[in-house]
C-alpha cells in the first residue's frame, strides 16, 4: 500500500488531514504560484494543486501525494492575503453584504502508477452587513493578515457570516476531505479501513 504525502506546510491542512486518523507525512512543494495571464480562478487552483502534488514525485516515488490550493474571489477578482491591517479592513468592507467564493483545487497523484485525480470544490461565504466598528474589532482580535479574504472561519470569523454554502465545510479551511476520501478509495486506500 503506498504511503500518503501531504504536499503542504500549512498547519490548517495538516490538522484537517489528521481528522482522518491515517498516517501521512508533510513535505513542502516547490511550485511557482504566479497566475498565468488570463487564467481563471478554477484553472489556477487546479493547475497549482496538480503541480504541488507532482512536484514531489521524484522524492516520493511510491506514494499517494495530495496537492491542494485555494483562492478567494470577490466580484470576479482574486482576493489574496491582506498582509496589513489596513488591507484586511478594506477586504472585509468590500465583502460586507456580499458573497465571497472560495475555490479549492485538489489533486491526488499516485507517483508509482502516474495516475492523477483532480477536482475543484467551490464554497460560498455569505457575509452579513458589517459596521466599520465590527470590522476594526475583528481585525484587532483575530489579526487575519495571512488569510485569504481576511478572515478565519475556524475562529471568530464565523461571526462575520450570514450563511455558508458548500458540499464540505473543510473546503473553506483548505482541504476538501469528502472529495479526498473519494479519491483515496479509487486508489484502493479506504480511510475507514486503515
UniProtKB/Swiss-Prot annotation:
Give the family per the record. Belongs to the Maf family. YceF subfamily.
Q: What is its main location?
A: cytoplasm
Report the subcellular localization.
Cytoplasm
| Residues marked Important for substrate specificity (site) | 12, 70, 154
The entry's keywords = Cytoplasm, Hydrolase, Nucleotide metabolism
Query: Which is a GO BP term held by this UniProt record?
Result: nucleotide metabolic process
**EC top class, as a word:** hydrolase
Q: Which Gene3D superfamilies does this UniProt record tie to the protein? A: 3.90.950.10
Active site at which residues? 69 (proton acceptor)
What is the organism lineage in this UniProt record? Bacteria, Pseudomonadati, Pseudomonadota, Gammaproteobacteria, Enterobacterales
| Summary of the function given for this chain in its UniProt record | Nucleoside triphosphate pyrophosphatase that hydrolyzes 7-methyl-GTP (m(7)GTP). May have a dual role in cell division arrest and in preventing the incorporation of modified nucleotides into cellular nucleic acids.
Show the PANTHER family listed in the entry: 7-METHYL-GTP PYROPHOSPHATASE, BIFUNCTIONAL DTTP/UTP PYROPHOSPHATASE/METHYLTRANSFERASE PROTEIN-RELATED
Return the NCBIfam families for the record. Answer: maf
Native source organism of the sequence:
Salmonella typhimurium (strain LT2 / SGSC1412 / ATCC 700720)
Entry EC number(s): 3.6.1.-
Under what name is this protein listed? 7-methyl-GTP pyrophosphatase
The protein's matches in InterPro entries, at most eight in alphabetical order, are given as: ITPase-like_fam, Maf-like
Q: Which reaction does it catalyse?
A: N(7)-methyl-GTP + H2O = N(7)-methyl-GMP + diphosphate + H(+)
Instruction: Output one GO MF annotation.
Output: nucleoside triphosphate diphosphatase activity
User: Would the keyword Signal turn up in this protein's UniProt record?
Assistant: no
